[in-house]
Amino acid sequence: MGLSDGEWQLVLNAWGKVETDIGGHGQEVLIRLFKGHPETLEKFDKFKHLKSEDEMKASEDLKKHGTTVLTALGNILKKKGQHEAELAPLAQSHATKHKIPVKYLEFISEAIIQVLESKHPGDFGADAQGAMSKALELFRNDIAAKYKELGFQG
């Protein structure tokens, strides 16, 4: 399920847009995740108290965590599928410490695509969306394989 060179280029072009305001994009991704799937908020002790979208938008901690999430994902995407070194510690922490199910990674993938679609409609058409979906699916499949190695049934 690899991506072609052209698809990777579409992914990296879109990611370049994210990096122009990684904190803003990250915050919006997390807000969409928490609003669309409130159960995911339970995995974040630091953010459980944030009940409204306004509270989430005002949270510097949420913005910082969004930056952390998208920076890590960007480092993985830039490896164009050759991301074993970057993925292993992420899978380890998400399986053993945070206990994040793969389903939640599907939810955040949807949120990432929605944010890119809304913030960059002219630069994130059907081809770019399809390529990003494939890249995020590759990431999730590889995380799921690592989870299995670690004995986490997430």
From Swiss-Prot:
- Tell me where in this chain the Globin domain is found: 2-148
Kind of enzyme, top EC level? oxidoreductase
The protein's matches in SUPFAM superfamilies, at most eight in alphabetical order, are given as: Globin-like
EC numbers listed for it are 1.7.-.-, 1.11.1.-
Question: Where does this protein hold heme b?
Answer: H94
> Which keywords describe this protein according to UniProt?
Cytoplasm, Heme, Iron, Metal-binding, Muscle protein, Oxidoreductase, Oxygen transport, Phosphoprotein, Transport
Query: Which biological process, per GO, is one annotated for this protein?
Result: removal of superoxide radicals
The record, for PROSITE patterns, names:
GLOBIN
Name where it's found: Cytoplasm, Sarcoplasm
Q: What Pfam families does the entry give?
A: Globin
Please write the reaction equations for the catalytic activity of this protein: Fe(III)-heme b-[protein] + nitric oxide + H2O = Fe(II)-heme b-[protein] + nitrite + 2 H(+); H2O2 + AH2 = A + 2 H2O
Query: Which positions bind O2?
Result: H65
Could you tell me the superkingdom of the organism this chain comes from?
Answer: Eukaryota
| List of residues that carry Phosphoserine | S4
Q: How does it assemble?
A: Monomeric.
Reported function: Monomeric heme protein which primary function is to store oxygen and facilitate its diffusion within muscle tissues. Reversibly binds oxygen through a pentacoordinated heme iron and enables its timely and efficient release as needed during periods of heightened demand. Depending on the oxidative conditions of tissues and cells, and in addition to its ability to bind oxygen, it also has a nitrite reductase activity whereby it regulates the production of bioactive nitric oxide.
Question: Under which name does UniProt file this protein?
Answer: Myoglobin
* Natural source organism: Ctenodactylus gundi
